Amino acid sequence: MTKSVMIVEDNELNMKLFRDLIEASGYETIRTRSGLEALDLAREHHPDLILMDIQLPEVSGLEVTKWLKDDEELRHIPVIAVTAFAMKGDEERIRQGGCEAYISKPISVPRFIETIKSYLGDA
């Protein structure tokens, strides 16, 4: 069974880039621009990994991550924060918010793919 990655990202160009890189690596994607939809989509599809933008329009990606980690059915799914926040202390704050890993924007393509594969293995 093909492993899947849910992408929660409101920027259309970032969404396309992440989708293309992930699908080219052999994984399926589930996509939403809305942090409010993320919980329902995760319950419906049970992705193997979630990529979470931290700066979403209606709700913080850290808040969505908290909802995921508070849900008995979903808390095992690793969440990788993808964010432009790259100041000292941001990674620690993001990890304390429940994210297992952190990728800063603009992304490094090799590091992005390496991080995804470190959680999912080869497709």
Curated annotation (Swiss-Prot):
Modified positions (4-aspartylphosphate) in chain numbering: D53
Gene3D superfamilies tied to this protein: 3.40.50.2300
SUBUNIT field: Interacts with DivL, PleC, DivJ and PdhS.
Domain Response regulatory: 4-120
InterPro entries in the record: Bact_response_regulator, CheY-like_superfamily, Sig_transdc_resp-reg_receiver
Keyword terms of this UniProt record: Cytoplasm, DNA-binding, Phosphoprotein, Transcription, Transcription regulation, Two-component regulatory system
Cited function: Essential protein that is involved in the control of cell division, probably through the regulation of ctrA. Its phosphorylation status is regulated by PdhS.
Name under which the protein is recorded: Polar-differentiation response regulator DivK
Database matches in SUPFAM superfamilies: CheY-like
GO cellular component, one term: cytoplasm
Main localization category: cytoplasm
